[in-house]
């Protein structure tokens, strides 16, 4: 009997060790965008989740490698709170950020598991080129009667006038897009349908109604002025590899506390899409329920590798950016969000990683990050938030997990007892996050409180000073006077202009951030600064480029 027991224990130990060992599988680089690349490395095993993967990258033909952010460990899982239930595979996954368009890169991956299993691989992937007409494109003039006679490789310069409601019915080709362009902005449409089109670009027109992009591939909407209850829509089957950039999109909603929140009478979406590989950047969007939005539940196709970059967002009665149902490698970066109920929603993230980097948020009447419905895989880095109530508040009973929350600046503060849409902005803590999973990490964040004593709360643990706490070993408490001009939205019902939230060179957030390769390499002093900005550096462009 004793021998059998020993054998059983030995077999069990071997079995457990085998389950902890990592077996590398297939590597994919799905849906390259114009400036970012994704890597998905499927694995078997690693039940104890300690496998890591270092990343280096370089342009093809260059000698020197640059370090990337390590891939994130994504265990296989599912979300029982979605309809239908969504599942994801066991893998290491991540993004390489801010690359050159139309460029081939080598990505070197080094996998290591201390319990067994290691591999080194080099994969090649290319970013998409900027989606512009080719130099040898044929330029022709056109009016309403010419719209559906334009050929691939032609640019149709639209005459001024009223075009009514138009459905385009011709496709371009790879390298030969069809471009419809107004150089004056006076080609005016009641609405536009690009449904099921491929390689069609709409540029510089005015649309007093929706632009429909259902079923599109490689289509572009650029430098248009759109005024509508629903701006740009891409419902099932969604859009693939599209680009929506440099537009001004204005809705019908004002900054009205009576209609804020999920149950408010605030119907209307600025840019609402489903699909993968899309780039939504440098738009100015204001006056909607959700200014930028994914689709949810049964309305969502796979939403991977979508880039939401450098948008200027104002007056979102529910969410500034609704990144819900993002599956993996969606990137929400360098957006400015002002006067919204919620800044950014990830309700839920579906495995991830999904990245929220260097966004700036001011005057939010509920929360900065809505991580609900068991969101998984949110990576929240270098954001700046200034709001009445809790700086970072998350009050769900459906905890998020597998999140990395680092190098952020959260400023909360005194507020009245007012609620918005039935929800409170919080009591004024620097942070109040009530529930989160065992695989989350908070560290190197800075917290401040305006107009009341400092306090923070993580789970049931309340603290009145930093650093050296259980969940924030390197977090810091800072004063609210970090900026060149003292700013705080003490009246959330007021419509604020976006303030300058760059820190002073001598502020306590300077040089206090953790170094993260390919995320904060551009610091100019000893170390990166906490928050969205580096002190002394110009801010990025928000909204349409000159």
Which residues does each predicted region cover?
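Recognizes extended acidic, P/S/T-rich segments that occur
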Residues: 54-102
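Glycine-rich beta-solenoid repeat tracts in large extracellular/virion proteins
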Residues: 148, 165-172, 188-196, 209-215, ...
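Beta-solenoid repeat scaffold
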Residues: 129-132, 137, 151-204, 217-218, ...
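Extracellular fibronectin type III
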Residues: 112-135
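Solvent-exposed loop/turn segments flanking beta-strands in beta-repeat/beta-sandwich domains
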Residues: 44-57
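Right-handed parallel beta-helix
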Residues: 159, 177, 181-186, 198-208, ...
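Acidic, glycine- and Ser/Thr-rich low-complexity intrinsically disordered tracts
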Residues: 154, 260-270, 399-546
